[in-house]
Amino acid sequence: MLPPPPRQPPPQARTARGSLRLQRAFLRGPLGVLRLLQLLAGAAFWITIATSKYQGPVHFALFVSVLFWLLTLGLYFITLLGKQELVPVLGSRWLVVNVAHDLLAAALYGAATGIMIDQTQRHSYCNLKNYRLPCAYHAFLAASVCGGLCLGLYLLSALYGCCRRYQGKEEVV
């Protein structure tokens, strides 16, 4: 009679998804800091607009700010978790996708800031000392400043991405 074969440990189950690890280099790097600042300034922009009485072209400014706030939030967390390869078609060109996002955001934030500056000037009549009726002048002025800040931050991150691409680097981090 033959001895029983030696017992082998069962094969380890492979997970379909890799483990989540934070990309600390991104978090501490210039693009990670710029993304956080973009999220803060963008939130200030759309919250300031949303809490005031607005109409007309201000709807476009609110749309742009919320859209790019959500897109930036998505880019930030996908890059932070290092899961850009899971994005179909675009994951292999993640640096180019980030630069295109930043340039488009800068262009549309420029238009939104122009709208807010125009609305601020149209409501400047209620900036008088003894004006008692409710007015959106201060909210529009704050939104104009936040929009200009967003525009500058997105231009900076686009410039940073272009510099990385020019140096021959393919990764965001």
Curated annotation (Swiss-Prot):
Domain MARVEL: from-to ranges: 26-166
Any one GO CC term of the record: cytoskeleton
Record's keyword terms, sorted: Acetylation, Cell cycle, Cell membrane, Cytoplasm, Cytoskeleton, Membrane, Nucleus, Transmembrane, Transmembrane helix
Cross-referenced InterPro entries: Marvel, MARVEL-CKLF_proteins
Keyword Acetylation in annotation: yes
Pfam families: MARVEL (PF01284)
Signal peptide span: none
Entry's transmembrane regions: 30-50, 60-80, 95-115, 139-159
Cystine bridges: none
Ranges facing Cytoplasmic side: 1-29, 81-94, 160-173
Subcellular location: Cell membrane; Nucleus; Cytoplasm, Cytoskeleton
Residue numbers carrying N-acetylmethionine: M1
Topology in membrane: Multi-pass membrane protein
Chain ranges on the Extracellular side, renumbered to this chain: 51-59, 116-138
Main function: Microtubule-associated protein that exhibits cell cycle-dependent localization and can inhibit cell proliferation and migration.
Name of the protein: MARVEL domain-containing protein 1
Species assigned in the record: Mus musculus (Mouse)
